[in-house]
Swiss-Prot record:
This is Potassium voltage-gated channel subfamily V member 1. Disulfide bonds: none annotated. Keywords: Cell membrane, Ion channel, Ion transport, Membrane, Potassium, Potassium channel, Potassium transport, Transmembrane, Transmembrane helix, Transport, Voltage-gated channel. A motif (Selectivity filter) lies at residues 392-397. Belongs to the potassium channel family. V (TC 1.A.1.2) subfamily. Kv8.1/KCNV1 sub-subfamily.
Length: 500
């Protein structure tokens, strides 16, 4: 590899400093006439000229430039033009007279490619995200497995996170869904429906929307507290008053859901959205319970018992009302996204716990079964003990008494601590990324609505109370603030802000 490195420095223009990656240390680069010394040829990448050596590139025959070097060398052999492929298959344009080949790519990223040709070690460009850098090196025919070990961990971690979040697809889906649901031109009362939709779905769009959002949160909290008090059966509580309060809360939730349903145009898509499914599940048990109780008047005792069990199960679903707060909480939505995106890590964690529980419960059972009045009466009982021990809960209802059993218990607890700690860093990184991505999107939507409102006022010659420059400045400041918080969160979680 040293010989190929010297071959790349075949031009007298490379007698300068070799101390910086950003300087032209790998090839000749200049504004003047291209150099064609010996086996050299010139590539023009993003407006910057680089003189490369065919001898150096021959060590990498499977890359784009390695193939181009073979084509250029073949052109210099007399009588070989008929069997040689066109260089335009490998570059965007070519000037055979000056032996110069053009590429419409980033010249800054190309320097890292040249460093790979010179040393055989590929480093990651700081200024590019992982997916953009991957696109660059794939274009030049370099595999990402060639990335040097000093950059590999950061690169693959950021790449996996970017692919999981899938920013582009998520943004496009949200925009198309936004446009579909916000098309109020079709149907009756478009202006009223649009204003009502803004109040229901955009808490920051107006004072009325903010008041509605606060009232909605209050009703959710009150309904949850009311559900808990109804189950307490305290003597000083008026159950009739609690039932009336339950009816009021359900009426609010029903009206909220019906208004949203009437506002949208694509109602099938509306019913498929997770927040709306949660809203529906929060109110359906109440009406199904009323229906079941009204139809059970003429049933037998056995049938009444079965109906009572159904009613109890339906009442349990009222706890789903807590999930309605996800409409007003970015943190809850981020938690849901994190759980769905970390299913592999969660599955791996459950697998580790299952293996540990199976092993330690069996060992503990055979260590304790000979003790009189032992609580380890069977292996399933030992499963419960191993589960509470590995998760560091330790209820104490089942505990070992022998020395051997206590040693096994110590190993079980220690294994649980180690197993639970393994995926925490990954899940924390995913949660932080989801949270700040949602915050950035919310900020972008708010600023877009403000600019749209300002543009509408300008078009109608209405009184303008804000300045366009101030709106833009607030947008930039909010984005910078969120980026700063994301960077600080990454550092505190053990990550590296090298990529931000």
């Amino acid at each position: 590899m040293p010989s190929s490195g010297r071959a790349l420095l075949d031009s007298p223009l490379d007698s300068g400093s070799l101390t910086s990656l950003d300087s032209s240390v790998f090839c000749s680069e200049g504004e003047g006439e291209p150099l064609a010394l010996g086996d050299c040829f010139t590539v023009n990448v993003g407006g910057s000229r680089f003189v490369l050596s065919q001898q150096a590139l021959s060590c990498f025959p499977h890359t784009r430039l390695g193939k181009l070097a073979v084509v250029v060398a073949s052109y210099r052999r007399p009588g070989a033009l008929a069997a040689v492929p066109s260089p335009l298959e490998l570059c965007d344009d070519a000037n055979p007279v000056d032996n110069e080949y053009f590429f419409d790519r980033s010249s800054q990223a190309f320097r890292y490619v040249l460093h790979y040709y010179r040393t055989g070690r590929l480093h990651v460009m700081e200024q590019l995200c992982a997916l953009s850098f991957l696109q660059e090196i794939q274009y030049w025919g370099i595999d990402e497995l060639s990335i040097d070990s000093c950059c590999r961990d950061r690169y693959f971690r950021r790449k996996e996170l970017s692919e999981t979040l899938d920013f582009k697809k998520d943004t496009e889906d949200q925009e198309s869904q936004h446009e579909s649901e916000q098309d109020f031109s079709q149907g009756p009362c478009p202006t009223v429906r649009q204003k009502l939709w803004n109040i229901l779905e955009k808490p920051g769009s107006s004072t009325a929307a903010r008041i509605f959002g606060v009232i909605s949160i209050i009703f959710v909290v009150v309904s949850i507290i009311n559900m808990a008090l109804m189950s307490a059966e305290l003597s000083w509580l008026d159950l009739q008053l609690l039932e009336i309060l339950e009816y009021v809360c359900i009426s609010w939730f029903t009206g909220e859901f019906v208004l949203r349903f009437l506002c949208v145009r694509d109602r099938c898509r509306f019913l498929r959205k997770v927040p709306n499914i949660i809203d529906l599940l929060a109110i359906l048990p109440f009406y199904i319970t009323l229906l079941v109780e009204s139809l059970s008047g003429s049933q037998t005792t056995q049938e009444l018992e079965n109906v009572g069990r159904i009613v109890q199960v339906l009442r349990l679903l009222r706890a789903l009302r807590m999930l309605k707060l996800g409409r007003h909480s970015t943190g809850l939505r981020s938690l849901g996204m994190t759980i769905t995106q970390c299913y592999e890590e969660v599955g791996l964690l459950l697998l580790f716990l299952s293996v540990g529980i199976s092993i330690f419960s069996t060992v503990e059972y055979f260590a304790e079964q000979s003790i009189p009045d032992t609580t380890f009466t069977s292996v399933p009982c030992a499963w419960w003990w191993a589960t509470t021990s590995m998760t560091t809960v330790g209820y104490g209802d089942i505990r070992p008494d022998t020395t051997t059993g206590k040693i096994v218990a110590f190993m079980c607890i220690l294994s649980g601590i180690l197993v639970l700690a393994l995926p925490i860093a990954i899940i924390n990184d995913r949660f932080s990324a989801c949270y700040f991505t949602l915050k950035l999107k919310e900020a972008a939507v708010r600023q877009r609505e403000a600019l749209k409102k300002l543009t509408k006022n300008i078009a109608t010659d209405s009184y303008i109370s804000v300045n366009l420059r101030d709106v833009y400045a607030r947008s930039i400041m909010e984005m910078l603030r969120l980026k700063g918080r994301e960077r600080a969160s990454t550092r505190s979680s053990g990550g590296d802000d090298f990529w931000f």
